[in-house]
Amino acid sequence: EYTAKGNLVGVISNGSAVLGLGDIGAQASRPVMEGKGVLFKRFADIDVFDVELDLEDPDELVTAVRAMEPTFGGINLEDIRAPECFEVEDRLREAMDVPVFHDDQHGTAIISGAALLNAVDVAGKSVDDLHVVFSGAGASAIATARFYTSLGVPKGNIVLCDSSGVIGTDREGLNEYKAQFASETDADTLAEAMAGADVFVGLSVGGIVSQEMVASMAANPIVFAMANPDPEIGYEDAKAARDDTVIMATGRSDYPNQVNNVLGFPFIFRGALDVRATEINEEMKRAAAEALADL
């Protein structure tokens, strides 16, 4: 009430997983973090300090961020690689009395979740019957898969694929986060997994989905090809792959139906700061997705 803390968010990164650039380090990540601050201010009038930490050890990251709690009304974690990002966020949420939100995870989950809620209506499908295939098994994919289950998608109907193919229960050496979504399936490849699927969620690399793969999906498929700067399949190619309705979205602004985190994170933090929330919980995330879907 008496200081700027109530309208101040820390955008904190170690630059280990910058979108489209990878592990470029703390210093090189600064333009991205400054840009994030501009979006916070432009859309939600939230002040931001960007903090780039030259730290890779999760223990050191947690200690450094916790020490900044007196300064910030909320913490936006950004571009921290998986699987360390899960541990870092979980520990900070437990330890801190201000909202801690890893946007690469939850921003993507919320915005694509809102898109999913509307897409099922257009496609004449039901959330609780969907079969969903993910290309990608990093922070955003795992968080989005978790969020889809909270929206009603059966966990057993979700298949995750990484660079080695389908993540099955027979795969050895999985980290605990990928193991949560290991599937009982005969499919080995992304192409095999997509056959008959209702939804494709791309959070991986460009150009890995063919028209034949889209053609193999269930009737009126939903295709969220969100890799940037190049989607897993182009908008025109996906639409031309079938004669029925293809609900197609990408992460790009030059195609229709852009799925972009900027639709969420400024306003989610605005609401959390205004009510002096101590966390951004699952109910708040679902409410944000449902509100976006209703726009």
Segments from the language model and where they lie:
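N-terminal ligand-binding/catalytic initiation module
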Residues: 1-99
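Predominant activation on well-ordered alpha-helical scaffold segments within soluble catalytic domains
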Residues: 34-41, 62, 66, 86-93, ...
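Glycine-rich phosphate/diphosphate-binding loop of Rossmann-like nucleotide-binding domains
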Residues: 19, 24-44, 96, 102, ...
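Rossmann-like adenosine-cofactor binding region
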Residues: 179-247, 252-254
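General beta-strand structural signal in soluble alpha/beta enzymes
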Residues: 13, 50, 76-79, 100-103, ...
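Solvent-exposed alpha-helices and their adjacent loops that cap or buttress functional pockets
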Residues: 2-5, 41-42, 67-69, 93-94, ...
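Adenosine-phosphate binding glycine-rich loop
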Residues: 103-104, 123, 129, 225-295
